[in-house]
Amino acid sequence: MDWGTLQSILGGVNKHSTSIGKIWLTVLFIFRIMILVVAAKEVWGDEQADFVCNTLQPGCKNVCYDHYFPISHIRLWALQLIMVSTPALLVAMHVAYRRHEKKRKFMKGEIKNEFKDIEEIKTQKVRIEGSLWWTYTTSIFFRVIFEAVFMYVFYIMYNGFFMQRLVKCNAWPCPNTVDCFISRPTEKTVFTVFMISVSGICILLNITELCYLFIRYCSGKSKRPV
């Protein structure tokens, strides 16, 4: 699946989202997917090529690079975006199932009076209620979990969010402790902090949307006749 396909699927989910959900999707597309596709390769394209160590020992440079960068930042962010977007696909499948059921009932004549034709069923906005409410709420909950887990993994794996100019490595087969230099550390630090900040904003938006959905759910129950 490429980014265009993912965008078209999530765009379909956006039609049935709350206002906060629409803001989250906008942030996801503009500040994460677009930035990752357009700018990430320019910033991180020289990762291993310009990782220089002051030794000529064969294999030392590769081992040190693997020690400090076990997973490429770009690949980790791409995996994060895929995992964060996956719960929204569950909502898309649930909406598609509901429409399929309505089409089936329409063809049988059970809901002929509710819709003019099948095209109206396709374009109708599906309300977030009933079982769809649970699917939608669960998807947001898992988005928060995935975002938090990836931020924690990123922090642990790279020992923080700031890129050092110089790192020391004594892994085998290096003959002793060698100095290794990272290319453009300031630029990479700024980019990393930006991506982490956007992840934090997405978490806040998801938590806000969860609170909104629960408040609306509770207020709806309180209005029902006893």
Swiss-Prot record:
**UniProt cross-references to Pfam families, sorted A to Z:** Connexin (PF00029)
Q: Tell me where in or outside the cell this protein is found.
A: Cell membrane; Cell junction, Gap junction
Entry's Gene3D superfamilies? Gap junction channel protein cysteine-rich domain (1.20.1440.80)
Extracellular topological intervals: 41-73, 157-189
Name the organs or tissues of expression.
Answer: Liver, kidney, intestine, lung, spleen, stomach, testis and brain, but not heart and adult skeletal muscle.
- Record field: transmembrane: 21-40, 74-94, 136-156, 190-210
Ranges per topology, Cytoplasmic: 14-20, 95-135, 211-226
Membrane topology, as annotated:
Multi-pass membrane protein
Query: What InterPro entries would the database entry show?
Result: Connexin (IPR000500), Connexin26 (IPR002268), Connexin_CCC (IPR019570), Connexin_CS (IPR017990), Connexin_N (IPR013092), Connexin_N_sf (IPR038359)
Its cellular-component GO annotations read:
astrocyte projection; cell body; cell junction; connexin complex; gap junction; lateral plasma membrane; perinuclear region of cytoplasm; plasma membrane
GO BP terms: namely: cell-cell signaling; cellular response to dexamethasone stimulus; cellular response to glucagon stimulus; cellular response to oxidative stress; decidualization; epididymis development; female pregnancy; gap junction assembly
Single annotated GO MF = calcium ion binding
Keyword Cytoplasm part of the UniProt annotation: no
Could you say which residues bind Ca(2+) here? Answer: E42, G45, E47
- Disulfide topology: C53-C180, C60-C174, C64-C169
Q: Which UniProt keywords apply?
A: Calcium, Cell junction, Cell membrane, Disulfide bond, Gap junction, Hearing, Membrane, Metal-binding, Transmembrane, Transmembrane helix
Q: Which residues lie within the membrane without crossing it?
A: 2-13
Signal peptide positions are none
The protein's role, per its UniProt record: Structural component of gap junctions. Gap junctions are dodecameric channels that connect the cytoplasm of adjoining cells. They are formed by the docking of two hexameric hemichannels, one from each cell membrane. Small molecules and ions diffuse from one cell to a neighboring cell via the central pore.
Q: Which family does it belong to?
A: Belongs to the connexin family. Beta-type (group I) subfamily.
How it assembles, according to the record, is: A hemichannel or connexon is composed of a hexamer of connexins. A functional gap junction is formed by the apposition of two hemichannels. Forms heteromeric channels with GJB4. Interacts with CNST.
Show the PANTHER family listed in the entry.
Answer: CONNEXIN, GAP JUNCTION BETA-2 PROTEIN
Query: What is the recorded name of this protein?
Result: Gap junction beta-2 protein
Organism of derivation: Rattus norvegicus
